[in-house]
Amino acid sequence: ITTKEIAKICGVSRTTVHRALNNTGRISEKTKRMILETAEKNGYRPDLLATGLAKGKTYYIGVVVMDVNNRYFSQMLSALEIEARERGYFINITLHQNDKEIEKEQLCKLADYHVDGIILSSVNKGEEYKKFIESLNIPVVTIDNKIADKIPFVTVNGRSAISKAVCEIAESGYEKVIFVCPPLAEKNLENIYVHEERTAGFKEAVKKIHGLEYVIIGNWDYQKQAKKELEKSEKKTAFLCTGDMFALNLIRMFEKNGKRAGQDYGIMGYDNIDFLEYVTPRLTTIDNHVEKVAEEAFNLLLQLMENKNVAETERILETVTVQGETI
């Protein structure tokens, strides 16, 4: 039913109906009650988008990420949805599947739908893309992958996290550490800022630890290469992976070859994805505080949408190591 039909049933003007439904303007309690009862009886549902456009605020937030099969992003989306719901917003989720053009298309569509703001994990980067983001004329907060300076940005300190992890591995008696970061293979093709930061942290740390041997695996054939590295290693060896799924894939692969994590080799992941509690042995990993990142990103976006003067638009959170049984 429409407001026009409600007005006809009640014998009043559409203006009076709008006043009753929005609780604004002067209207008698008797008329207001009649209109509200008619609306409820006939299943009236307001056009929130039209109402929002009229008020200049839709209470819709666009969220653009890679995919939902990645446990990190599924946890991120869940956390963002909770943040939005608690503040009276609704999120519109769209995926770019690591495709630069799809990402741009989805951002344009969100702008066309008049969302109030956007939270973006981008596969694009650079000054030209920064200009495109600014041309949307919508507050945008990026998470994890930095696009360019002065674009609002929330992430964790991956460089420091990996650097500390290398020290912890060395202190645990390991003489060789193999850094596993498959996304490095995409360095010249897409935005892999978080993985570049983690790699930088690794390189900085190994240079400071005398006698620690290291290898960097930066391709998608990482399982095969990791197997070769462990087979030829004569030293106590640990793997440091830039994602829990990379670590779990290695554990599964080595188990098929009769080698046990924490006994025949050490291994540490990154992300602290939610289902690690069901994995044995418990993977030692780095908690990147996905819920805190979501909260910070939403709070920052909220401030920008409310046109508040935000002094610091880059938020870097610290991580912690979650001790398991594999280091």
Regions found by a protein language model. Give the residues of each.
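N-terminal helix-turn-helix DNA-binding module of bacterial transcription factors
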Residues: 1-59, 72
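Short beta-strand segments enriched in small/hydrophobic residues
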Residues: 16-19, 53-69, 176-188
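Bacterial carbohydrate/catabolite-sensing allosteric modules
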Residues: 41, 82-87, 135-142, 146-327
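Amphipathic helical "hinge" segments at domain boundaries
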Residues: 42-117, 196, 203
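Short beta->alpha connector loops
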Residues: 44, 97-100, 121-126, 220-221, ...
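Short hydrophobic/charged patches on amphipathic alpha-helices used for structural packing
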Residues: 50, 104-107, 130, 166, ...
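Structural motif
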Residues: 64, 119, 238-240
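Active-site-adjacent beta->alpha loops and helix N-cap segments on the catalytic face
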Residues: 125-134
